[in-house]
UniProtKB/Swiss-Prot annotation:
Keyword entries, A-Z: Amino-acid biosynthesis, Cytoplasm, NADP, Oxidoreductase, Proline biosynthesis
UniProt-listed GO biological process terms: L-proline biosynthetic process
Name of the protein described by the UniProt record: Gamma-glutamyl phosphate reductase
Subcellular location: Cytoplasm
Family of the protein in this entry: Belongs to the gamma-glutamyl phosphate reductase family.
Domain of life: Bacteria
Function, in words: Catalyzes the NADPH-dependent reduction of L-glutamate 5-phosphate into L-glutamate 5-semialdehyde and phosphate. The product spontaneously undergoes cyclization to form 1-pyrroline-5-carboxylate.
Gene from which the chain derives: proA
CDD domains: ALDH_F18-19_ProA-GPR
GO molecular function per UniProt: glutamate-5-semialdehyde dehydrogenase activity; NADP binding
GO-annotated cellular components: cytoplasm
Amino-acid biosynthesis listed as a keyword: yes
Involved pathway(s): Amino-acid biosynthesis; L-proline biosynthesis; L-glutamate 5-semialdehyde from L-glutamate: step 2/2
Main location: cytoplasm
């Protein structure tokens, strides 16, 4: 039997058990998963070092190496994330609403698991742990297909997590990893409709578009970034500088990092030299339009391709705009619908930006880096959805459920 189909069958069987697992059973599994992760930390870090060595040989960027890297602190954070899930409300079984019809029928809408979730992702081994924990708490089985860059790390993490699941008494096939990282296997997984109920890609634009174009399994499209910060003519310069530096440099290889800076022309000559100097102190390469190049020296000319590009690196594109309307128009044309921010002390401009920018998260006077399940109070997230169907924004436990109708009668016929 095809190995992928076997994993699908096992996941489907596990999903029927998880569907009816109690909150205490799922929480016990999460606690044990966290314990096993820490018990195996030396082994996991050793396997991660193999991935890092391979990545360095391939000339992987510093920012991408940071995404791939695991140490004791990050493993402790991953285990802590599993424990935080224990404290979150279990969405399964919640009756969202209920009403009574004139014929006496009582109709309720109840949260239930999706079933089997497939996740295709790239070089972030922490996703392995986050996805496993979230899916299990929401009563779903999960099949993971990580990138080749993190294969040793992922195998070690899944081995530890599965030990915890098995020890708790829940099905050991609640979590499975596809160890074959070939594109052919990924394409086959995208068409496994009989077993996978929904597919969630996490990674760069190339991966996400490949899944969207090739999958026959329903897809929830997640977060290519290209986030913008617009500095309005009535912005506080110190606040703007702090937000821009944080949004660009704290973790440049994540999807909620700032990639583009738009500056109102009325403040450009005063503000741009300051912010460009601050960015260069953080080793950020600055690319700008022709107007930016007139104000600042040693700026690389931005091309049309730059405006729609997610750099995931210490690079920023800067454009001078005439007013807030041009900023909004530019964002809605080139943005990915992820996270966008305005820095302003003008209330009317802040409201215009909130209402007219088409994105999952829109900020006034705050960093785009807050678009995150934990920061929003959801606990960990499975990804940031940039589409509008089913889920939008950080996807926590509720977004990993669907609904069914439950109807109580006393003999009604139609």
């Amino acid at each position: 039997m095809n190995e992928l189909i076997l994993k699908g069958e096992r996941a489907k069987e596990a999903s029927y058990v998880l569907m009816n697992a109690t909150t205490s059973e799922k929480n016990d599994a999460l606690i044990k998963m966290g314990q096993k992760l820490l018990e195996n930390k030396d082994y996991i870090i050793a396997e991660n070092e193999k991935d890092l060595e391979n990545a360095m040989l391939k000339g992987t960027s510093k920012a991408m190496l940071d995404r791939l890297s695991l140490d004791e602190k990050r493993l402790e954070d991953m285990a802590d994330g599993l424990n935080q899930l224990v404290n979150l409300n279990d969405p399964i079984g919640e009756v969202i609403t209920m009403w009574k019809r004139p014929n006496g029928l009582q109709i309720g809408k109840q949260r239930v698991p999706m079933g089997v979730i497939g996740i295709i992702y790239e070089a972030r081994p922490n996703v392995t742990c986050d996805a496993a924990g979230l899916c299990l708490k929401a009563g779903n089985a999960v099949i993971l297909r990580g990138g080749s860059e993190a294969i040793n790390s992922n195998k070690a993490i899944v081995k530890a997590l599965c030990e915890g699941i098995k020890e708790s008494g829940l099905p050991e096939y609640s979590l499975q990893l596809i160890e074959n990282t070939s594109r052919e296997i990924a394409n086959e997984m995208m068409r496994l409709n009989e077993y996978i109920d929904v597919l969630i890609p996490r990674g760069g634009a190339g991966l996400i578009q490949a899944v969207v174009k090739n999958a026959t399994v329903p897809v929830i499209e997640t977060g290519v970034g290209n986030c913008h910060v617009y500095v309005d003519e009535e912005a506080d310069f110190k606040m703007a500088e702090d937000i821009i530096i944080n949004a660009k440099t704290s973790r440049p290889a994540v999807c909620n990092a700032e990639e583009k800076l738009l500056v109102n022309e009325k403040i450009a000559e005063e503000f741009l030299p300051k912010i460009i100097s601050a960015l260069r102190e953080k080793n950020v390469e600055v690319r700008g339009d022709s107007n930016v190049m007139k104000i600042a020296d040693d700026v690389k000319e931005a091309t049309d391709e730059d405006w729609g590009k997610e750099y995931l690196d210490f690079i920023i594109g800067i454009k001078i705009v005439n007013n807030i309307d041009e900023a909004i128009k530019h964002i809605n044309r080139y943005g990915s619908g992820h996270s966008e921010a305005i820095i302003t002390n003008n209330y009317q401009n802040s409201q215009k930006f909130l209402q007219r920018v088409d994105a999952a998260a829109v900020y006034v006077n705050a960093s785009t880096r807050f678009t995150d399940g934990c920061e929003f109070g959801f606990g960990a997230e499975i990804g940031i959805s940039t589409q509008k169907l089913h889920a939008r924004g950080p996807m926590g436990l509720n977004e990993l459920t669907t609904t069914k109708y439950i109807i109580y009668g006393n003999g009604q016929i139609r």
